[in-house]
Curated annotation (Swiss-Prot):
Keywords from the UniProt entry: Iron, Metal-binding, Oxygen transport, Transport
PROSITE patterns membership: HEMERYTHRINS
Origin species: Lingula anatina (Brachiopod)
GO molecular function, a single term: iron ion binding
Name assigned to this protein: Hemerythrin subunit beta
Amino acid sequence: MKIPVPYAWTPDFKTTYENIDSEHRTLFNGLFALSEFNTQHQLNAAIEVFTLHFHDEQGQMIRSNYVNTKEHTDIHNGFMDTMRGWQSPVPQKALKDGMEWLANHIPTEDFKYKGKL
Protein backbone atom coordinates (compact mmCIF):
# COMPACT_ATOMS: atom_id res chain seq x y z
CA MET A 1 0.00 0.00 0.00
CA LYS A 2 1.14 3.52 -0.72
CA ILE A 3 2.35 5.63 2.21
CA PRO A 4 -0.53 7.92 3.21
CA VAL A 5 0.05 11.67 2.99
CA PRO A 6 -0.18 13.11 5.54
CA TYR A 7 1.26 10.10 7.36
CA ALA A 8 -1.69 8.96 9.44
CA TRP A 9 -3.95 5.97 9.98
CA THR A 10 -6.95 5.93 7.64
CA PRO A 11 -9.98 3.59 7.47
CA ASP A 12 -8.11 1.70 4.72
CA PHE A 13 -6.09 0.16 7.58
CA LYS A 14 -9.14 -0.97 9.60
CA THR A 15 -8.75 -4.51 10.95
CA THR A 16 -12.28 -4.66 12.49
CA TYR A 17 -10.76 -4.91 15.99
CA GLU A 18 -11.18 -1.52 17.69
CA ASN A 19 -8.36 -2.04 20.19
CA ILE A 20 -5.92 -3.00 17.44
CA ASP A 21 -7.08 -0.16 15.18
CA SER A 22 -6.59 2.28 18.05
CA GLU A 23 -3.07 1.00 18.64
CA HIS A 24 -2.34 1.18 14.91
CA ARG A 25 -3.31 4.87 15.01
CA THR A 26 -0.76 5.30 17.80
CA LEU A 27 1.92 3.61 15.68
CA PHE A 28 1.28 5.99 12.79
CA ASN A 29 1.36 8.93 15.21
CA GLY A 30 4.61 7.69 16.76
CA LEU A 31 6.40 7.42 13.43
CA PHE A 32 5.00 10.77 12.29
CA ALA A 33 6.22 12.46 15.49
CA LEU A 34 9.62 10.84 15.06
CA SER A 35 9.82 12.12 11.48
CA GLU A 36 8.90 15.64 12.63
CA PHE A 37 11.08 15.98 15.73
CA ASN A 38 13.65 13.19 15.32
CA THR A 39 14.91 13.27 18.90
CA GLN A 40 16.07 10.44 21.14
CA HIS A 41 12.93 10.99 23.21
CA GLN A 42 10.69 10.51 20.14
CA LEU A 43 12.67 7.46 19.05
CA ASN A 44 12.27 5.91 22.51
CA ALA A 45 8.54 6.72 22.47
CA ALA A 46 8.11 5.11 19.03
CA ILE A 47 9.94 1.97 20.12
CA GLU A 48 7.78 1.81 23.25
CA VAL A 49 4.45 2.06 21.39
CA PHE A 50 5.52 -0.57 18.85
CA THR A 51 6.69 -2.88 21.65
CA LEU A 52 3.42 -2.51 23.56
CA HIS A 53 1.29 -2.96 20.45
CA PHE A 54 3.13 -6.05 19.26
CA HIS A 55 2.80 -7.55 22.76
CA ASP A 56 -0.96 -6.85 22.79
CA GLU A 57 -1.56 -8.09 19.25
CA GLN A 58 0.48 -11.26 19.74
CA GLY A 59 -1.32 -11.92 23.03
CA GLN A 60 -4.64 -11.67 21.23
CA MET A 61 -3.35 -14.12 18.61
CA ILE A 62 -2.25 -16.60 21.27
CA ARG A 63 -5.57 -16.39 23.13
CA SER A 64 -7.39 -17.05 19.84
CA ASN A 65 -5.08 -19.90 18.80
CA TYR A 66 -4.34 -18.00 15.59
CA VAL A 67 -2.52 -20.42 13.30
CA ASN A 68 0.07 -17.90 12.02
CA THR A 69 1.10 -16.48 15.41
CA LYS A 70 4.75 -17.58 15.17
CA GLU A 71 5.20 -16.28 11.62
CA HIS A 72 3.58 -12.97 12.56
CA THR A 73 5.66 -12.67 15.73
CA ASP A 74 8.85 -13.28 13.73
CA ILE A 75 7.89 -10.42 11.39
CA HIS A 76 7.32 -8.13 14.38
CA ASN A 77 10.64 -9.16 15.92
CA GLY A 78 12.47 -8.39 12.69
CA PHE A 79 11.04 -4.89 12.58
CA MET A 80 11.82 -4.31 16.26
CA ASP A 81 15.43 -5.36 15.62
CA THR A 82 15.53 -2.74 12.87
CA MET A 83 14.00 -0.01 15.05
CA ARG A 84 16.30 -0.77 17.97
CA GLY A 85 19.23 -0.32 15.59
CA TRP A 86 18.17 3.25 14.79
CA GLN A 87 20.08 6.08 16.43
CA SER A 88 18.89 9.62 16.85
CA PRO A 89 18.66 11.50 14.63
CA VAL A 90 17.21 8.70 12.54
CA PRO A 91 18.21 9.06 8.87
CA GLN A 92 15.34 10.02 6.55
CA LYS A 93 15.79 6.80 4.54
CA ALA A 94 15.29 4.69 7.68
CA LEU A 95 12.22 6.72 8.66
CA LYS A 96 10.75 6.28 5.18
CA ASP A 97 11.46 2.55 5.32
CA GLY A 98 9.75 2.32 8.72
CA MET A 99 6.73 4.23 7.48
CA GLU A 100 6.51 1.99 4.41
CA TRP A 101 6.88 -1.11 6.58
CA LEU A 102 3.89 -0.15 8.73
CA ALA A 103 1.75 0.98 5.79
CA ASN A 104 2.40 -2.39 4.11
CA HIS A 105 2.38 -4.64 7.17
CA ILE A 106 -1.19 -3.89 8.17
CA PRO A 107 -2.88 -4.75 4.84
CA THR A 108 -0.55 -7.62 3.91
CA GLU A 109 -0.05 -9.31 7.30
CA ASP A 110 -2.57 -8.00 9.84
CA PHE A 111 -5.52 -8.35 7.48
CA LYS A 112 -4.82 -12.11 7.42
CA TYR A 113 -6.22 -12.36 10.96
CA LYS A 114 -9.49 -10.54 10.24
CA GLY A 115 -12.31 -12.61 11.70
CA LYS A 116 -9.88 -15.00 13.39
CA LEU A 117 -9.06 -13.29 16.69
